[in-house]
Design a protein with these regions (language model features):
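C-terminal structured domains
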Residues: 298, 302-446
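Amphipathic alpha-helical assembly segments used for oligomerization, scaffolding, or translocation
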Residues: 1-330, 351, 385-389, 444-445
Length: 446
């Protein structure tokens, strides 16, 4: 099939640019993973080294021209990093919630011990009372408080015989422990709402959101009448769940903004620099309202820059390949192609024949067809036209080989057979005011 063709071109230049953009976003994703883990207190140096090793392996793929593998694996790696970071945040939240529950249990136990000591008429030292009432010291003060509840030693005035008898009587008796004492106390029911609050508060902390206003309200619930506690707790839980949802979304948006800023870092245009500055200010100010618009703007700019790069690279690759095959390619033809939508190249060895290139302006599809130069008034040698169209078939295959050898590729989307349509005739008359680079040739259909 060597008649008019519609084809796609992928160049090594385009593939390298796309892969480098992927790697920049991967670097930003690794930095985001590190930041999240450090903030949550779950940083793992060994895992961080593994992340870096995988990143280095992916970069080696670029050096080895393994473009397809890299473009598949980098998005998967970024997805894994995000998922892993979220899992670690959730684990940190669970651990923090458990710590909150433990502190709450310790505070309850300390209050119970103080009440028991007071009821037993024990003299509680001021420092012990202070330690039992302070959350950070309550747990370690409990053993000392419990010791005051334990049976007192025998009176020092007792005789040796009395002490010996008491020792024999208690020899096989198990001494009560704090756990035994707690087991004998009325059970304190931990509300499900308290556990959920702890989890939400912990996740807010892990997300970098200040949980103190919610924590203060949660603490104040204990002072409310029991008839109102459930209603207030439900209301607080709704607000906490909403805050966590917003925190996750904001964290994801800012992470995406940082990745986009990293991808824009190689673009030194005025527009890209200004956009990077705006992204930086939005992230620093935690301006979630402008994040969505900035993300859309950054993606549009990146896509447009890549489209222009890819389009220019495709035109250059095709023109350079045709020059290698003996077609006359002049400086400025790429520009003429962009401006005019098509360009005609003459075959140096057979100047009465050539090819016409078009497309690539509004889509990534290019068109090519063999053409003949001459006059509409002159008779055509149809047999020779068919022969030259067949020659172009083999030359197009060589063009595919050349582009492939440079790391790119050409894929034919649609092609007609030799002779399926008459050879397009280009009126070979150049106007005096035209240059060699841009020929405004009158096109006639024979």
């Amino acid at each position: 099939m060597s008649g008019p063709k519609v084809f796609h071109v992928v160049t090594r230049e385009e593939l390298v640019a796309r892969c480098e953009a992927h790697l920049r976003r991967l670097d930003a994703a690794i930095a985001e993973w590190t930041k999240t883990c450090k903030r949550s207190g779950v940083m793992d140096a060994e895992v961080a080294e593994q992340n870096a090793a995988r990143r280095d392996a992916l970069r080696r793929m670029l050096n080895e021209d393994r473009f397809t593998e890299l473009q598949k694996q980098v998005p998967a790696e970024i997805s894994f990093l995000r998922s892993d970071a979220q899992t670690r945040v959730e684990r940190a939240a669970v651990a923090a919630a458990q710590a909150m529950q433990n502190r709450r249990r310790a505070a309850r136990t300390a209050r119970m011990l103080l009440e028991a000591l007071t009821k037993a008429g024990r003299d509680v030292p001021a420092d012990l009372k202070r330690d039992l009432e302070a959350p950070e010291t309550a747990e370690r003060a409990m053993a000392r408080a419990f010791a005051l509840l334990s049976p007192v030693d025998l009176n020092s005035a007792a005789t040796d015989r009395q002490r010996k008898l008491a020792s024999e009587l208690g020899r096989d008796e198990k001494r009560a422990t704090l756990a035994d004492w707690l087991a004998g106390q009325p059970a304190s029911v931990e509300r499900e709402s308290e556990l959920r609050m702890d989890r939400h508060l912990a996740e807010l902390t892990a997300l970098g959101v200040d949980p103190s206003p919610f924590a203060a309200r949660a603490a104040a619930l204990m002072g409310e009448p029991s008839s109102r506690q459930a209603l207030l707790a439900d209301s607080l839980l709704v607000e906490l769940a909403h805050a966590v949802k917003e925190g996750r979304e904001k964290s994801a948006r800012f992470a995406e903004l940082r990745e986009l800023a990293a991808e824009l870092a190689h673009d030194d245009s005025t527009g890209a620099r200004a956009l990077r500055d705006r992204i930086g200010m939005a992230v620093a100010a935690e301006d979630g309202l402008s994040a969505a618009a900035l993300i859309a703007e950054a993606n549009a700019l990146i896509q447009e820059k890549m489209r222009v790069l890819a389009t220019d690279a495709r035109r250059r690759a095709v023109l350079q390949g045709l020059a290698t095959l003996g077609y006359e390619v002049n400086e400025g033809m790429a520009t003429a192609w962009v401006q005019g939508g098509q360009v005609v190249l003459r075959k140096a060895a057979n100047p009465e024949y050539g090819v016409e290139l078009g497309g690539g302006t509004k889509s990534d599809r290019l068109q090519v067809r063999a053409v003949a130069f001459g006059s509409a008034q002159s008779p055509r040698n149809t047999s020779r036209d068919l022969d030259m169209e067949a020659v172009w078939c083999s030359e197009f295959q060589r063009l595919q080989t050349l582009v492939s050898a440079s790391g790119g590729g050409i894929e034919i989307e649609h092609a007609l057979a030799v002779g399926a349509t008459p050879l397009k005739l280009i009126e070979d008359a150049t106007r005096p005011d035209e240059t060699d680079e841009v020929r405004n040739l009158k096109t006639l259909q024979r």
